[in-house]
């Protein structure tokens, strides 16, 4: 899902790679449609009613950032496919990279704040800090949203500075993308500036996300065991609700993990972009990205209500 993974100067002609690229495009379309529906459904309700649950506001933020991110990645994929010999730091690709850096950071931070909200509101820990956070967290929602924009903007500017300096070096020295000197300048900047910056900016929200998810899954697991001991089994509504919540959280965590690993692998060059394994890995990640919005649609009460109303309106029932 990394927008920087395309290596220019070569066109993909292998049949297997073309098939996987086609699958990737289809999965991206599914992810775009799913996140677009989530954003539109909750966003319209937010605008019309002027009220929305804090959790749903975070879902709007996450859905919008994912929708825009997938659209930018698809646009870059199409551009690179149509212009395989394009200069890597031309204005078009710099503009797409600028958008990708911002939306990628916004997606990471939106996911992180959503995990924080889930952890504080759902976890059943009895520590006084948790009780204090439960009462304060909803009031901090605007700051969460603004911090996502602020942190994303700050890191995007830092990435843009590095990319723009490489672009200026190429122009100043009249270098070509495939020139040895140009490659050494690019690798030096990647190794000592961009790669450390990527690891810092990506690891910070990921660490918070993991801590919150571990706490939340542990709390729900303990609560489920207690519910099983005091009820007749898995058919009890309370037990089923906890199982559904666990499955939704696990799918959310799996998507976030795969997304983070794709960023790290791409930045470290573990899977070369023209390698077949790279496209297989990307297909698995986008499969998770396409499935997760569907899980959200059926696990969120408001989204389920929107789906039911759409079905009833199509069937002509009141």
UniProtKB/Swiss-Prot annotation:
It is found in: Membrane. It is a multi-pass membrane protein. One of its GO terms (cellular component) is plasma membrane. Keywords: G-protein coupled receptor, Glycoprotein, Membrane, Receptor, Sensory transduction, Taste, Transducer, Transmembrane, Transmembrane helix. One of its GO terms (biological process) is sensory perception of bitter taste. Residues 29-40, 110-128, 205-234, 286-318 are cytoplasmic. Expressed in subsets of taste receptor cells of the tongue and exclusively in gustducin-positive cells. Glycans are attached at residue 179. Pfam families: TAS2R. The chain crosses the membrane at residues 8-28, 41-61, 89-109, 129-149, 184-204, 235-255, 265-285. Gene3D superfamilies: Rhodopsin 7-helix transmembrane proteins. The keyword Endoplasmic reticulum does not apply. InterPro entries: TAS2R (IPR007960). One of its GO terms (molecular function) is G protein-coupled receptor activity. Residues 1-7, 62-88, 150-183, 256-264 are extracellular. Most taste cells may be activated by a limited number of bitter compounds; individual taste cells can discriminate among bitter stimuli. Receptor that may play a role in the perception of bitterness and is gustducin-linked. May play a role in sensing the chemical composition of the gastrointestinal content. The activity of this receptor may stimulate alpha gustducin, mediate PLC-beta-2 activation and lead to the gating of TRPM5. Belongs to the G-protein coupled receptor T2R family. PANTHER family: TASTE RECEPTOR TYPE 2, TASTE RECEPTOR TYPE 2 MEMBER 60. This is Taste receptor type 2 member 60. It comes from Homo sapiens. The lineage of its organism: Eukaryota, Metazoa, Chordata, Craniata, Vertebrata. The gene is TAS2R60.
């Amino acid at each position: 899902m990394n927008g920087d993974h395309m290596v220019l100067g070569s066109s993909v002609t292998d049949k297997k790679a073309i098939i996987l690229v086609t699958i990737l495009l289809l999965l991206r379309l599914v992810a775009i449609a799913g996140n677009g529906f989530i954003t539109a459904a909750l966003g319209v309700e937010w605008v019309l009613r002027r009220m929305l649950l804090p959790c749903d506001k975070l879902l709007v933020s996450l859905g919008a950032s994912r929708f825009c991110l997938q659209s930018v990645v698809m646009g870059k994929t199409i551009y690179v496919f149509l212009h395989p010999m394009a200069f890597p730091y031309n204005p078009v690709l710099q503009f797409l990279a600028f958008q990708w850096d911002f939306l990628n950071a916004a997606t990471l931070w939106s996911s992180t704040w959503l995990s924080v909200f889930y952890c504080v509101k759902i976890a059943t820990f009895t520590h006084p800090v948790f009780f204090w956070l439960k009462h304060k967290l909803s009031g901090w929602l605007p700051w969460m949203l603004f911090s996502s924009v602020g942190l994303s903007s700050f890191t995007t500017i830092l990435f843009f500075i590095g990319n723009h300096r490489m672009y200026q070096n190429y122009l100043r020295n009249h270098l070509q993308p495939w020139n040895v000197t140009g490659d050494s300048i690019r690798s030096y900047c990647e190794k000592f500036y961009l790669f450390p910056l990527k690891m810092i900016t990506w690891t910070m929200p990921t660490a918070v996300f993991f801590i919150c998810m571990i706490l939340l899954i542990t709390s729900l697991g303990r609560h489920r065991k207690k519910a099983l001991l005091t009820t007749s089994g898995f058919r009890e509504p309370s037990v089923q609700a906890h199982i559904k919540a666990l499955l939704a959280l696990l799918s959310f965590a799996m998507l976030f993990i795969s997304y983070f690993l794709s960023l790290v692998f791409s930045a470290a060059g573990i899977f070369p972009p023209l390698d077949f394994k790279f496209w297989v890995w990307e297909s698995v990640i986008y499969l998770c990205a396409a499935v997760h919005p569907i899980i959200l649609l059926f696990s969120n009460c408001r989204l389920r209500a929107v789906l039911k109303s759409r079905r009833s309106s199509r069937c002509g029932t009141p």
